Amino acid sequence: MAQCNLFYQYPITPILEGHVRNILICTEKDVEKLQSQSSLRLREKIDQGHRDKLLRMRLKTELDALQKKMQKDSDVLNSHLKAIEDALLFTNDGEVNVETKADAQLIPKSPEKLEKFNQVAITPLDPFIRFTDDFRGEMINTFFNNAQMWNFTFGSWFYKLKRVFYNEPGLRRALKLTNVDSLTISKELLAVTVNALEQATVYPIFGSEMSDLEAALCILAAFYSTYENSQIDERTTLVDVITLLPVIFRLLGSEITALKNVSPSGTYFGFNDPSCMKFFVPMRKGKHYAENTFGNHVLIKMLLGRGVMQKIPGEKISQNFDVEARLHGAIKNDVLVYWTYQLMRPKLGNNVPIFIHDQHYLRSGLVAIESLFLLWRILNSESLFNKRVGKFLLTSIFPQLENVDFAENNFEAGNIQNFEYLMHHYVVPMYNLQNDISISTLFPGLVAVCVNESVRLGWEHKCAGAPSDAVQVQSKENPFVEYIRAQMEQQADVAILEKHDCILFHLENGLNITLSFTLPRQRLFAMASSLFNVNDTYDFIYFLVLGFLPIPAVI
């Protein structure tokens, strides 16, 4: 068997055997490093995927816009080609003389030169008004182009502005002011003043993702959704909410009346700002106002009571919701967040702000609700078919119109819908034209009346807590004078912003004062009549929309 040993044994004896520690060793530090590198690469891939998705979405949007533009240009070109072909058919010799005026009109124009017209209606008594881009600016131009044969007055408030600026040589030349004794004002002064009225609720510093009107519509939609059989669902748009405003305001009025019966302060529409507050922008992290700023606001109490809002950070009014969160582990779904996302998602995508965190949206939305609610209470209080006592006629701006008297003596209307008509034929077209439009841009006349109501009482932040039985002297001049002067003199941006926010604070206080009255119409009409030539509902509606009311002056 010795010869067979090699069959069972290795022919070569191994010299070096494998060591017991001759293995791959990976420490915990190495494992963590590998995990970190893998996580980093995975994060980079995820971020790259998000970037690619955003780029694809942006590319799709640009391609869709380009496709629509090309389709529009193609339709325009086809229409012009058809017009040229029709002209060629009627030509005897088969040639077209492009130098003639008639044929020159058939030459296709570039899409940039094609005019796009929009139209709105203010009252059911008057025809639609067509304009191109700037409704109010074009109305001012039309008025001054057609008013050369007459002298017009715009009220004592505009005349006082003229007297103030007339005494300053630089502003007098810039605004082209002459003849200080005349009640008429220049086109430049009217345009600058109306622009200041339009910009009252437009915040000029940071780019807001939504306007105050959109914020108000989101809040009202969330409020309306808490009622049974409400005409609102996931397919509802902001335009639909505008058409539902009369129904919503009836419910809102009932809720406010109920709160008024429970508490004497149930009609307080103001904010508890700190003394000497100068700027509208929140000072706490740029998002939150001071503690308990919204504590006494009647709309906040109503929204919390209806379950529309669950909590406002740092507010004493919402401490009971903290208890609920601790007991049940979570707070109920926020109705306001849900409807804000539903209504604003088509415009903003997933970047929809949350009002309880970005509180400037909440505050501006509440002010817009107050403005619309005040209009609803006033405009439907009197029919336009009653016998008129006002002197404004649309022929003052459009002389080609005929004066038609629709008034009836002893007219009784069972269903007045002045507010509904204005929303449907004015607010909706203006919002479709410019979806970031604000309340002051829609109704500059309302800004003028409410601000002057606050200024007349001498209100300021530092005296906001003064006793109600004491009268307050006015320590400052007209805030619009300071704002216009700051703009014309090109003062520092901070100075202009401070004067702009002063107007906004006066607007908030003026709305609070007016809405606290049982009959706000008499209060506003008394102010508008003494300052802006307003004498009836027809005059008031046009003043709300235009921001001025020209009346022929007898020299």
Swiss-Prot record:
GO cellular component assignments: host cell; host cell nucleus; viral capsid
Taxonomic placement: Viruses, Duplodnaviria, Heunggongvirae, Peploviricota, Herviviricetes
Compartment(s) where it occurs, according to its Swiss-Prot or TrEMBL record: Virion; Host nucleus
Role summary: Capsid vertex-specific component that plays a role during viral DNA encapsidation, assuring correct genome cleavage and presumably stabilizing capsids that contain full-length viral genomes. Participates in the interaction between the capsid and the tegument through interaction with the large tegument protein/LTP.
Protein name: Capsid vertex component 2
One GO BP annotation of this record: viral penetration into host nucleus
Alphabetized Pfam families for the sequence: Herpes_UL25
Entry keyword set: Capsid protein, Host nucleus, Host-virus interaction, Viral genome packaging, Viral penetration into host nucleus, Viral release from host cell, Virion, Virus entry into host cell
Keyword Nucleus: no
Gene label: CVC2
Region spans: Interaction with major capsid protein/MCP: 1-47
